[in-house]
Amino acid sequence: SQAVMILPQPQDEKEKLKRFEGIGQRAEMAMAALPKEANSHYFRAFGLGRYSQMISIAKALSQGLASKVKESLDATLKLAPKHAEAQTALGLYHAEIVGKIGGMIASLTYGAKAASADEHCKLAIKLTPESPIALIEYANALMLIHGDKKEDEAAALYAKAIKLKPKDAMEALDIAHAKAQMA
């Protein structure tokens, strides 16, 4: 629950970093206690992934965070192949790395590929077609990898997300975020 509360709240950046790092650490304890529970692995990836997004790419890569995130997402999907959030996160993992360091280096060093980002994001949407975050994150992945070349496609995904009816408070926040991006 802490993970859901951190994202939309305007807070001190150091406090956010500390909280995301804490999520990753608690998830590691959960992984040790519940190694066959997919969400133990997923929340480690989530916490470390969000933490990584807040620090410099050089720092995140030097700390081995990309490998840890990928390892956790792979474990999640091995246990639960239809885990839509993990599919979305793995798509974004590929997109973040390709977008930040380029396709060739991303592929050779981390196995990250633009085509894999596309594949995982599309599968997440197929698994959860009414999920605003799956649409939003796919739009973000397109922009990270392709920039302005895919702006129209990304805008269409945001527009589709905005039209969805939220099923809970987090989805309402996701839709509000999409609306703000479109403004």
Where are these predicted regions, by residue range?
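Short coil/linker segments at helix-helix boundaries
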Residues: 2-36, 46-82, 92-127, 144-152, ...
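Long hydrophobic alpha-helical segments typical of transmembrane helices together
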Residues: 138-183
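"A position-specific structural signal for the A-helix of alpha-solenoid helical repeats
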Residues: 2, 43, 50, 89, ...
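Surface-exposed substrate-engagement region within the catalytic domains
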Residues: 123, 131-135
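A broadly tuned, weak detector of single residues within folded domains
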Residues: 38, 84, 160-161
